[in-house]
Amino acid sequence: MIYSSEPIAADKVVEAGVIGTGQYATAIVTQAQSIPQLNIPIVADTEIESAKRAYQLAGIDDSQVIVADTRAQALSGIERGKKVVVADPYLLMDLPLEVIAEGTGDATAGAVHAATALQNGKHVVMITKETEVVVGSLLRQRAQQAGLVYTAADGDQPSLLIALIDWCRQIGLEVLCGGKFGEQRIFVDLPNQKLHLSRNRTLTLAQEQANLFHPLIGPNNHSHLLETTVERQSLLDQLIDIRTDDLIELGIVANATDLRVEKERLHH
């Protein structure tokens, strides 16, 4: 699930720490500057310059950013209103933070960071999809037992799909299936009867195959539409590379919604 709550009080500021400075985690640091009720006083990354870069992208002057090697140094910096960068993510666990956002992109590290944060009474936002799909359910159970919140991060395809499914169910609709836009793009070149695929692959279509990709117009002939769709799917299933991102993201959705993965290579 994606955790949501009632709006927090106008004068409440959530203190959160970020581990990892990939694209998504860095976006949290930069966007926090536009959210009065969110403060990111500390960022951890094994590459200190990457952590500094996150604050630079957020418009924070270098004079306001310090590097800390110990908890005492980090705490002193936070208390003085500085932005702190550290190489050791475990320094965040014993600081006055309510939430840890884990964004290393490493499944094992993400699991250990999240488990440690929960042990130290921190809520956890899991950005690392590789961790969420493997042990997210277990971490969520631990959080619930401790009276804490563990949630996947909002804003990416899995969370948006989960939210849509939840909304449909809340208004009484039965959800039969769910899906997302695949990571692999296929470009249909009808004039030249070609399909352009990933890794610079091109497939020349026979006329009968090319006809499958013409717009389906004309009388509302259900059997024709179904037949054409099935034939398209049969052709594409032989060509599409299954991307890890697709498997991970739809695995997250399946875990969160109780929809099952019907086919190992997914439907396309």
Predicted regions, residues:
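Short catalytic-loop micro-motif centered on adjacent basic/acidic residues
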Residues: 41-42, 100-102, 125-127, 150-153, ...
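N-terminal glycine-/serine-/threonine-rich beta1-alpha1-beta2 phosphate-ribose binding loop
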Residues: 1-116
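Glycine-enriched alpha-helix->loop->beta-strand junction motifs that scaffold or abut catalytic
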Residues: 96-97, 121-123
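Conserved active-site and cofactor/substrate-binding residues in soluble primary-metabolism enzymes
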Residues: 19, 23, 46-50, 87, ...
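Core active-site phosphate/anionic-ligand binding loop and the adjoining beta-turn-alpha structural block
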Residues: 137, 149-268
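Conserved beta-strand edge residues that scaffold enzyme active sites
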Residues: 47, 106, 131-132, 157, ...
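Rossmann-fold NAD(P)-binding glycine/threonine-rich loop
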Residues: 107-120, 128-156, 161-167
